[in-house]
Amino acid sequence: YAAGSDVDFMAHVVEAVAAREDVCLYPGDWFGFRVGSTHQERIKWEPDSRERLACLCVPSVRNGHLTTEMVGFLEDAGACLLNLNLFPTLSPAERQATAEALTPVLGKSILSISFSRGFGLTASQLGVALVPRHHPYRAKYAQTWEWFTYFFNGIAARAFLALDLDAVAKVDSDRREWVAEWLRSKGLPLIESGSYYVKAFRPAGGEVPEPLRPLTRDGLVRLSLIHI
């Protein structure tokens, strides 16, 4: 399926499920999973996802990683909605390890990809969702999904087939090096692992400087470094 943006499709999925039951977001992960819903009371920031829809960015915008606890969060869930926008920003070795960690949950997962970030087509917000053929949500929502995605499916297919994956990988490699150099130049900790796109820091002494307070949640300062 495809939509005008990945956020459109994810918002529809969360809204449809939250109309019937609770939806779980991993604490500290992406706030965008809930902003389009009219059922805020059913969208929970909690790690206990048993038998419910679990939503997570891969890697998480909490800290730029996919942790063991996050994998457990997905394994316990009845279904998963995975936002893969930042997956290409991991190093090749980490992408391989992350893909292997996700393999057991793919059969129950909806995979959401934004061409604007995940595949570097920054002039487009086009989003694609990959849904297993026998996923239970297809029986419930396929007619609706087909109705509002049919216009974008052909556009998405042509855009994807035109991608030069080697060129995209080169861009990600250059960005990763630029971010590392920027962190060094500012005297900030350099964490080699995880996404170069987002880095999280826990301030020493617990005091957060005033300019960084808007970027702080759950005691972590998060920087989206590609926009600097």
Where are these regions (language model features)?
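PLP-dependent class I/II
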Residues: 1-226
